[in-house]
């Protein structure tokens, strides 16, 4: 692509975050002749993928998880392993010759007329023609403010620190939280030699098979993503009854709300990668939600007291965007989430984009790839028009 002086802004587009979302936007911008600089606070791309637990694989298929301009190698298999995702991201950055600056953290973003000023590590003040925030859906570990937690002397860690079951061999472990991470860690512990595994559940999740009769759950998510919520709820219930065992006797009754309703509230379905069989076999015991920590014990919602050797809190993450953007009007909602995403900008902040802050049932990487192209197209069009 050839560019004219009008198409070349004085300042680059800054992309904050060197994960898949940020890399995809940078590559899509470069493809359109727009200079993009990726700012990554760690020392390498794909930082979060490097620290995920060992057994993690994509819950989406290889064919539907590639980023713009580079397919995931067929040799990685249908369900790509964590380490292979890292290798793919490294290759992606190399192939597209992306301009990446590591070891730089952005602390604050300010509007400066038609441009943006980023305040970063080492007193840097960087001026960009546009900014894409791609710091990640799972940014900062969230730990509930349980009563008595400060005085608890037992072993407590967030799921972000979990790597494999080896340190928990023979131990009594309580996993708190029944999302995808908590469910998989519980299954991993049960299969990996933990003495006892309990899973504390507050809201019963929707569980789906990764594949049903060879058909990936992701493809179903793509097909139904534009259907009315009530319709998807009914379809989800039919599939649950036909293809999933009744786990009510094991502490996992039918969820109170439908699958799509819960997804709209931010709770994606749990893909089964071992939890169902572990629960049915009694290797994972479902218990009530954690209410407090008291006298060295964990107090559950049903009044039960337990004293596990270790507690792993799979209690989610915060976006942690408030320090970066909380001072700007009309950018974040009351929960600290971006008011828009993809190719849309907040009304009061033209030139500010958000990438990767949704978790759709059609697959996060797939949607990152789609949104990256849309964002790049929008930015390039604005530059060509002299905006």
Listing of model-derived features with the role each one plays in the protein:
Residues 2-42, 46-48, 77-217, 221-387:
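Flavin (primarily FAD) cofactor-binding/catalytic cores of flavoenzymes
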Residues 71-77:
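A short acidic, helix-capping loop that chelates divalent metal ions and anchors anionic groups
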Residues 44-71, 99:
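Redox-cofactor-proximal catalytic regions of oxidoreductases
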